[in-house]
Amino acid sequence: MKVIAVTGYKPFELGIFKNDHPGVECIKKALHRKLITFVEDGLEWVIISGQLGVELWAAEVVFEMQVEYPDLKLAVFTPFLEQEENWKEDNREYYEFILSQADHVDSITKRKYESPEQFKLKNQFFIEKSDALLAVYDEEKPGSPKYIVESAKKKGEIENYHSYFILFSDLQDIIEEEQWNNAE
């Protein structure tokens, strides 16, 4: 596997409203654990759409990993131009920082938002251009990643395409592990 698409919930879907929320570190730790095994097996590119939440946290994880794995690259393919246009200023600044550090940035539709069709095109692009999908996603709480996860599963039924998931139970395990380590 050379290219993996990473996605997951938006912050509000997780009840997270600031990047210094303790849940963010837990999610980043889970992403790191998954990505490190893929990197050691030859992963070269992580691709995201630049969506707030899991995707931008994954970008931070990639940046941290690049210290030890300088060949690991991050690409941000936005579904449309200026997706951050209506975001709060601190979110825009955070997003622009991620874009400034990414190895490749492009827009899939190359135009501003017009319709939900642009999100479908984004999902198709990600599934076509990646070898696998990694999602912070639990089927018991579908949310925004539902459509790309469904597309990935369909591709997996007809081709050698894998979907990997970080479930809420995985995040709970990390929280308990941290509590155990801090109690010692």
From Swiss-Prot:
Pfam families found in the cross-reference section: YpsA
Family matches, as InterPro entries: YspA (IPR010697)
Annotated family: Belongs to the UPF0398 family.
PANTHER family (UniProt xref): UPF0398 PROTEIN SPR0331, UPF0398 PROTEIN YPSA
Identification of the protein by name: UPF0398 protein BC_1561
Species lineage: Bacteria, Bacillati, Bacillota, Bacilli, Bacillales
